[in-house]
């Protein structure tokens, strides 16, 4: 668990790497980033950042990778060194260092992991972190919370965390389109075919690859899902979308159920945190599906504010 240099001014290590303040100052370490379930005691005169995570495939490092990189870059920019540490110095700290190399040195996921292994042969990230690093690479090494890839990842992580969903974090819900003004919007709007209530926008559609098998997510390789097909899937009879604010009452405390129009209560589709199969054969987890036959597409014309329904 001692400190091992990966780059000039960047060290990786385990729990013991901070046991000697003398060793830290001898190495010029001015900042320590700890990725562990518990926050360690502070070392005097050393900047500290803590990311709470266990070494489990279901732990989320991805959403914190940009913050981690900024913290490490700031320490090194001032001429000091930074140490990234976890308990064993094998998986969590290695994943964060690899992400930093990807973002700052332009390395791909495999190259970055190989670079850390060259310095520390026992380095071995768990399969969940491997998938998160691939996803980070697919997003151009910056966490884009509006991207389809990230939205799907976040929902997948949520679905694995609970057997009975209680309260869902606000950020997983798309804003109800009835609450936003319609002008200057190039997005397509989807509304209930029966009562015309606006339900969701095209940016909420989480497209998937056609065909058999599960969608590739955190624990699997995501290289497939990076090559997403567009929304022109002929074989798919449903739209799979992110949750929208109006669905919240239906989702509380249950694993699956129907999705009804909040205005006229006609059946639009269904949801399941365990996942559901699309008509094209692809298994999607979790699934929030709206039958295409139950909604109309509305395109906003760039001139003025007239809505034109696609017949």
Where are these regions (language model features)?
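Glycine-rich, flexible N-terminal cofactor/catalytic loop recognition
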Residues: 2-39
């Amino acid at each position: 668990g001692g400190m091992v240099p990966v780059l000039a001014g960047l060290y990786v290590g385990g729990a013991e790497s901070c046991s000697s303040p003398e060793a830290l100052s001898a190495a010029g370490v001015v900042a320590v980033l700890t990725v562990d379930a518990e926050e360690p005691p502070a070392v005097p005169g050393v900047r500290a950042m803590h990311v709470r995570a266990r070494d489990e495939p279901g732990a989320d490092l991805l959403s914190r990778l940009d913050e981690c990189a900024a913290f490490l870059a700031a320490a090194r920019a001032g001429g000091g060194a930074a140490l990234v540490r976890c308990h064993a110095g094998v998986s969590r700290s290695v994943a964060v260092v690899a992400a930093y190399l990807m973002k700052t040195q332009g390395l791909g996921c495999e190259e970055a992991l190989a670079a850390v292994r060259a310095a520390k042969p026992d380095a071995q990230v768990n399969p969940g972190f491997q998938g998160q690093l691939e996803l980070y690479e697919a997003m151009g090494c910056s966490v884009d919370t509006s991207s389809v890839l990230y939205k799907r990842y976040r929902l997948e992580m949520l679905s694995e965390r609970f057997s009975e969903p209680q309260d869902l974090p606000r950020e997983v819900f798309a804003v109800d389109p009835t609450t936003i003004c319609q002008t200057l919007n190039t997005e397509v709007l989807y509304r209930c075919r029966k009562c015309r209530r606006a339900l969701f926008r095209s940016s909420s559609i989480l497209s998937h690859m056609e065909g058999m098998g599960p969608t590739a997510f955190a624990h699997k390789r995501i290289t497939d899902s990076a090559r997403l097909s567009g929304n022109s899937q002929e074989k798919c009879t449903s739209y799979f979308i992110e949750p929208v604010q109006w669905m919240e009452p239906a989702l509380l405390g249950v694993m699956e159920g129907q999705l009804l129009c909040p205005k006229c209560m006609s059946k639009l589709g269904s949801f399941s945190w365990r996942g559901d199969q699309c008509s094209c054969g692809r298994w999607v987890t979790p699934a929030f599906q709206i039958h295409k036959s139950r909604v109309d597409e509305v395109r906003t014309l760039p001139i003025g504010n007239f809505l034109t329904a696609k017949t």
